[in-house]
């Protein structure tokens, strides 16, 4: 998997609590190899995400089931809406994510009962399942 934090390349300071330095929106480019997923099935506590599929074929797992997506498709998930993007095609699945970048974001993982809490940025996180655990524990 490959992720490029475009907003950070444009000067976003992810650890800043100053919203003018954080940018109001976060833009990420993602490439997911065939048969892999972007992240475990999860729901954000405060964040909205808009997905724009650039190329490839995928399956979006959500609370109502699964939906196939292809290049040109767009979809959105709001807070407390669990989701996961799985590459169900033979080629890389490439898409953009535009998120609203809230301060104090956390995520819940329904399959494992874990929580991810961002201390100052997504890179500075702790994952809790009764006690701190590995990020992919119980997800694979």
Where is each model-derived feature located?
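A short, N-terminal "cap"/entry segment at the start of jelly-roll beta-barrel domains
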Residues: 1-24, 34, 110-140
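Conserved short histidine dyad/triad with adjacent acidic residue
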Residues: 10-15, 28-44, 79
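Short, conserved beta-strand element in jelly-roll/cupin
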Residues: 29-33, 43-62, 98-102
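Structural motif
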Residues: 50, 57-59, 66, 82, ...
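Short hydrophobic/aromatic patches on the structural cores and recognition surfaces of FHA
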Residues: 56, 72, 85
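Ligand-binding loop in jelly-roll beta-barrel domains
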Residues: 79-105
């Amino acid at each position: 998997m490959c992720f490029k934090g475009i907003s950070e390349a444009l000067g976003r300071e992810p650890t800043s609590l100053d919203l003018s330095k954080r940018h109001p929106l976060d833009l990420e480019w993602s490439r997911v190899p065939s048969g892999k997923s972007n992240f475990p099935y999860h729901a954000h506590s405060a964040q909205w995400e808009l997905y724009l599929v650039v190329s490839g074929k995928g399956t979006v797992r959500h609370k109502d089931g699964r939906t196939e997506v292809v290049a040109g498709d767009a979809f959105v998930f709001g807070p407390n809406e669990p989701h996961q993007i799985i590459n169900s095609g033979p080629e890389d699945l490439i898409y953009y994510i535009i998120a609203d970048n809230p301060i104090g974001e956390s995520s819940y993982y329904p399959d494992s009962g874990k929580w991810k809490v961002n201390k100052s940025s997504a890179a500075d996180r702790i994952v809790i399942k009764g006690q701190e655990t590995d990020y992919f524990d119980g997800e694979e």
